[in-house]
């Protein structure tokens, strides 16, 4: 009995439309997969992970405040994807200094300056403790969204910080201005406001009119900028 003829094989060139279409599909999938990974999965561990595009595009980052160190800055642990990607229930956030080492960003609140605490033997400004306690109560141990604007000379990420409260999403810098525990940043070279400078100044003017916080000091008020020039720069 003669053998059954084998099915003829098709010699497909790498330039065949089917091959080109498949290659294009794989390449596209890899490209968008990588973009998705960078945007929603990859953790930003330190300021060194912040690419120029993240800064230039003011890419929002979601994360957890692990520590408030001063009246206008805090430590931020990036949790990309938030609850939907398991943070807080499947993926645990470190709690010890050892485990958090080289895993957080130091965030400097944009557009504002809080009273200086006691550092290096220098005295503390009035309302520095109140500002620190207020910020701790407001953001410490909570999730926030930051919008990075720049990295300052101390390797801090100057950013807008927003947090959800029962009354809606709040701008942390704006809330500090409202209660008079910060003033609008006076420096020119490193000032970052996003699109909020006019709004911040209006909030400051209202707090000043109502003599909130530091504005209750009246003529005895030394702004944080003036205080730093006197005590840290010898002016």
From Swiss-Prot:
<keyword id="KW-0255">Endonuclease</keyword>
<feature type="active site">
    <location>
        <position position="116"/>
    </location>
</feature>
<dbReference type="GO" id="GO:0004519">
    <property type="term" value="F:endonuclease activity"/>
</dbReference>
<dbReference type="GO" id="GO:0046872">
    <property type="term" value="F:metal ion binding"/>
</dbReference>
<keyword id="KW-1133">Transmembrane helix</keyword>
<comment type="similarity">
    <text>Belongs to the LCL3 family.</text>
</comment>
<dbReference type="InterPro" id="IPR016071">
    <property type="entry name" value="Staphylococal_nuclease_OB-fold"/>
</dbReference>
<protein>
    <recommendedName>
        <fullName>Probable endonuclease LCL3</fullName>
        <ecNumber>3.1.-.-</ecNumber>
    </recommendedName>
</protein>
<feature type="active site">
    <location>
        <position position="108"/>
    </location>
</feature>
<feature type="transmembrane region" description="Helical">
    <location>
        <begin position="15"/>
        <end position="37"/>
    </location>
</feature>
<keyword id="KW-0106">Calcium</keyword>
<feature type="binding site">
    <location>
        <position position="113"/>
    </location>
    <ligand>
        <name>Ca(2+)</name>
    </ligand>
</feature>
<keyword id="KW-0378">Hydrolase</keyword>
<keyword id="KW-0496">Mitochondrion</keyword>
<dbReference type="GO" id="GO:0016020">
    <property type="term" value="C:membrane"/>
</dbReference>
<dbReference type="InterPro" id="IPR035437">
    <property type="entry name" value="SNase_OB-fold_sf"/>
</dbReference>
<dbReference type="GO" id="GO:0005739">
    <property type="term" value="C:mitochondrion"/>
</dbReference>
<keyword id="KW-0479">Metal-binding</keyword>
<keyword id="KW-0472">Membrane</keyword>
<feature type="active site">
    <location>
        <position position="156"/>
    </location>
</feature>
<keyword id="KW-0540">Nuclease</keyword>
<feature type="domain" description="TNase-like">
    <location>
        <begin position="59"/>
        <end position="217"/>
    </location>
</feature>
<dbReference type="Pfam" id="PF00565">
    <property type="entry name" value="SNase"/>
</dbReference>
<keyword id="KW-0812">Transmembrane</keyword>
